[in-house]
Amino acid sequence: MCNGGGHLTNKLIELGFNVKATDLVYRGSGIGGIDFLKQTEIFDGDILTNPPYKYALEFVEKALQLINVGNKVIMFLKLQFLEGQERRRLFDTMQLKKVYVFSKRQQCAKNGVFIGSSAVAYAWFVWEKGYHNLPQLEWI
């Protein structure tokens, strides 16, 4: 899901991971025409993506619905995803296991092109279905 140009996908494949890459729009990598938010089939694995921020909550909730207990949802999100009353109910489920905060501001590419610097703080958020403890915060 949200495969985009395949930058994350290609790196994961290079590292030896078994990857299923989809996106709503085909951009030269993976399978296009797949609306992740309409998926119903349980996925036996972990889900990793960089979702559109305005739909991030919906992507996290859908991903947690689609995986088995013990599997993970890993999302590259703005650090400010931690804020907000609407997202609070998601965090109350206690399935957020780790947040890896980037020590250095990350530059995000649009269509594979990096432009300028970033004023936005990002983090990798890791949920584990069935995890019932406080989340851990780490820096990378």
What does each model-found stretch correspond to?
Residues 1-140:
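Class I S-adenosyl-L-methionine-dependent methyltransferase catalytic core
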